[in-house]
Amino acid sequence: MLTKDVKEAVACDEEAQIERVKDFLCSYRMCAQMLQLRRYERKKRVLSEEYEWETDLLGGGEAYWRARMLEVRSLIESMRNGREKLMLYYHYIRGESIEHAADLLGFSRRTGYRVHSRALFAVSFLYERRRKNRE
């Protein structure tokens, strides 16, 4: 039987793991917004004829942002089909709130939050496995 200290340490580790994966999943929307900002800046400068290719406002990050978005999408797609996978897709890829995603999936808000937390727990193991395979 595990002691109280060991149980607390395991719980803290799981919480940290879930926070890491949550930050990783949230990066999808940030990268999408950065790409959108990049397109807007490019369009604005081309239209005003002040565009200089050497002085891009956000130079060099596009490849990274696209790769990061692809990583997030592939992590979610690697999950088994089910409510958890759909919840993560609607919330992190499509940018819907948890409440609206639950509505779209046909269950209550409370169930939506439960499914979301279960999904984060499940995907955190996939994320950690991928991270360890890269090292």
Which role fits each region the language model picked out?
Residues 1-78, 99-100, 124-135:
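N-terminal interaction/assembly modules
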Residues 106-126:
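DNA-recognition helix of helix-turn-helix
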Residues 94-110:
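Helix-turn-helix DNA-binding module
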Residues 83-84, 109, 131:
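Secondary-structure boundary/capping signal
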Residues 78-79, 106:
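Short, conserved sequence motifs enriched in acidic/basic residues, glycine, and aromatics
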Residues 79-96:
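Short amphipathic alpha helix immediately N-terminal
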